[in-house]
Amino acid sequence: VRGRVTVKPEGLSRFVTALDNEGLHRWGPLAPCSRVSVEMDNPQLNWVGHAYMDSNEGDEPVENGFKDWDWARCEMANGDTCVVYDVRPQRGPHRVVAQRFSPNGDHEPFTPGQRFALPASGWRIPRGMCNEINEAPQIISTLEDTPFYARSLLRTTLMGEPVTAIHESLDIPRLVSLPVRLMLPWRM
């Protein structure tokens, strides 16, 4: 595989928030509204589209802070990016962080609608996502399915707009289990 991937931020964001109830784990999108171009020489493929860059950091191991989480992001019709972080902390109540980001760096919270259980992945990873209409979001395809993590494309409605979202589910007890830790050096 040979080629070039170029990510061009349309603007930078200074938004950072706690994901857990004690403020020990933080998330912030660095460039939530970006463009990406992929130019491959071998194989000869080209692609351009919406991109997103973020950062997570913590003052303790992830397994100390969380049981699992679902995360999703989508590009809105006007070029904004909506992100939903739906986390189940080890301590305290369930948390949902939902923010809409503009290319100029502005952001605003929003209410993402009711959470629906989605079909488990092939590795039986539980998945869930919100939708503003009274039906479960539709999984278009599962892009990655491992013993602890699933990434999918799905259709849902956020802020009154039907969207296609990148969705991720992480099962942290599985991530830190001995069999998975032994497999991590190899592609799963």
Regions found by a protein language model. Give the residues of each.
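Structured soluble/peripheral alpha/beta segments that form catalytic or ligand/cofactor-binding pockets
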Residues: 1-188
